[in-house]
């Protein structure tokens, strides 16, 4: 078992409520939701932070928007809308060092987020 909880969910060593998966991405409901809809979208490849993206990740990241759009559709938040967040490193609020996107919806979002 890996020390990365997201890698363990990807490998199915730990259960996660899977919302979507393809050959590059896996999405699952957050166990500590900050909104009625809170999905974590993670690349299957272990990339620690946004700062660790390299040229060879273009294809994965290029598909990210399409995947987010599919998940918003699955969760019925495309309309009226949703928020997407990527935290990077400690000051950015990142707790799990496996790049991931938060999709939040199901309520009115406020600004600034905090």
State where each predicted segment sits.
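HIT superfamily nucleotide-processing domains
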Residues: 1-114
């Amino acid at each position: 078992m890996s020390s990365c909880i997201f890698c363990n969910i990807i490998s199915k060593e730990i259960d996660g409520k899977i919302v979507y998966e393809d050959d590059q991405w896996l999405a699952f409901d957050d166990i500590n939701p900050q909104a009625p809809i809170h999905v974590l979208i993670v690349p299957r490849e272990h990339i620690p932070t946004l700062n660790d993206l390299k040229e060879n990740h273009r294809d994965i990241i290029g598909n990210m928007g399409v995947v987010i759009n599919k998940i918003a559709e699955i969760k019925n938040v495309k309309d009226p809308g949703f928020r997407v967040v990527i935290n990077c490193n400690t000051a950015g609020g990142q707790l799990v060092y496996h790049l991931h996107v938060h999709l939040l919806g199901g309520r009115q979002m406020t600004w600034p987020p905090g």
